Amino acid sequence: MTCTFHAYEQLHAQPEVVAAVHTLLREVEQADGVAALGEAFLKGIDGDHGHQHIVAMTDERVVGVLALDGAVTASVSGENPTAELAVAPDVRRQGVARGMLAAAREDLGLTGPLDTWAHGDLAPARAMAEAANARRTRELHKMAVDASPGSDRGEQFRAGAEDAASKVESQGLTVLTYPEAVERFGEELVDEEWVRVNNEAFAWHPEQGGWDIDQLRSARDTAWFDPNGVLMVWSCGEDEDAAGPRCAGFHWTKIPTEEQEEPEGERAGEVYVVCLADEARGKGLGPAITMLGIGELMKRGVGTVELYVEGDNGPAVATYEGLGFGIVHTDVVYRGELN
């Protein structure tokens, strides 16, 4: 097989190549049962998000793509660039992945450590990591539970959501959807509070922490986003008038676009982001906010509830297992040298 490798600083400006890459990604997902690229990297293909790409082509089609998240900036700042890649199933183990990595060195000038996501940690990814002497540095579990209408688990979650609402109200807090909060407090304040709580909750997180309002709005700029699927818990009683309203936490739920077309009760929805402000910790609000969001997903026709949790967060994994969640698959970061 003759294969050529092309570097793109602005892949989104090449619509024919973008279309061919998406064809490849659909082929890979159908074969592997898991998407090769995550949401952020998909957005980096379709829009200007500072990503770089190596695309592997034969005369007939695109057979591989390597996506790099701000690689040059990361290298200059001393951080490790992060990558995700996909190779067509029928040309694996023929040097396509190695060729794309070599092109990243030669055409984009990348050297040093590279963190590469392997979604599902499938055998081809493990083989490539072993050949490159790469090591696991991070695991992210996808967990899911059947909460279909009429099931014991579904009824448990419905009751749990009602109890959670009572717990929140008993602490003098108010649950508002994002549009309700904007109507009451104004978009600027609500977005500032959203970012504040996010950054307090994810101060440790390599991707989710350190956001600004522009990053928040970019994250919301996606086809599946429903502002009514964001539940925010507010302290806004009379005793808070001097300081103004404060967000104690929020639960951002997600129902993917394709799932929205499924019949009610058969949709998959995600516990996408749950955050608690520092000042709200130690009051039992974290589990309550989580359950409020699960209840909202079920009201919107979700029968399978999904979430992602860090593999080294044993207490969280145990908590979700106690709620009936099981690990569906694990995404892994492998760190290897580009030199």
UniProtKB/Swiss-Prot annotation:
Enzyme Commission designation: 2.3.1.189
Keywords: Acyltransferase, Repeat, Transferase
Cysteines paired by S-S bonds: none
GO molecular function, one term: protein-N-terminal-alanine acetyltransferase activity
Residues the entry annotates as binding acetyl-CoA 1: 85-87
InterPro entries found in the cross-reference section: Acyl_CoA_acyltransferase, GNAT_dom, MshD_Acetyltransferase, Mycothiol_AcTrfase
Record-annotated N-acetyltransferase domain positions: 8-174, 176-339
Known catalytic reactions: 1D-myo-inositol 2-(L-cysteinylamino)-2-deoxy-alpha-D-glucopyranoside + acetyl-CoA = mycothiol + CoA + H(+)
UniProt-annotated binding residues for acetyl-CoA 2: 274-276
BP GO annotations: mycothiol biosynthetic process
Its job: Catalyzes the transfer of acetyl from acetyl-CoA to desacetylmycothiol (Cys-GlcN-Ins) to form mycothiol.
Subunit-structure text: Monomer.
Protein name: Mycothiol acetyltransferase
Source species of the chain: Corynebacterium urealyticum (strain ATCC 43042 / DSM 7109)
Highest classification ranks of the organism: Bacteria, Bacillati, Actinomycetota, Actinomycetes, Mycobacteriales
